[in-house]
Regions:
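RNA pseudouridine synthases
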Residues: 1-142
């Protein structure tokens, strides 16, 4: 798979992660963005040594979006410092069937992670290891 790289220099890579591809995986033989980008760096490098690549943040496997990776330890340290100091937002766009009752709102539910299948499911607040999931939304376009 050829990565969709939006920006690359000697320190960082910004790429588009397709839906369905994990950011990284511990399962050998399955494609993930770390493997794909390490192959890209290796193929385009004159050094032909194992490339350094640090994951700065992740996106869930079903999600498509931008990812930032560091190509050097110094860049990883600086990007992580910036992330800790300033943070950043994750903004999602979705196509809905039907329309929420209000144009802005907050949806809240509880999720529990299943480590065996690496999935999460909706649960009750009383479920052991349940974590609150909160989504703030704003309808930007309504087409009737």
């Amino acid at each position: 798979m050829k990565p969709h790289i939006l920006y690359e220099d000697q320190d960082i890579i910004v790429c588009l992660k397709p839906a369905g591809i994990p950011t990284q995986t511990s399962r050998p033989g399955l494609p993930d963005m770390v493997s794909i980008l390490k192959n890209h760096i290796y193929q385009n490098s004159a050094h032909k040594k194992q490339p350094y690549l640090a994951v700065i943040h992740r996106l869930d496997q079903p999600v498509e979006g931008l990812l930032v990776f560091a190509k050097t330890p110094a860049a990883a340290k600086e990007l992580n410092r910036q992330l800790q100091s300033f943070g950043f937002g994750k903004y999602y766009q979705a196509v809905l069937l039907g329309c929420p009752q209000t144009a802005d709102g907050i949806l809240e539910d509880y999720l529990v992670k299943d480590g065996r299948t690496n999935t999460s499911r909706i649960c009750t607040e009383e479920t052991p290891d349940a974590k609150v999931a909160r989504l703030s939304y704003h309808l930007s376009l309504i087409h009737i």
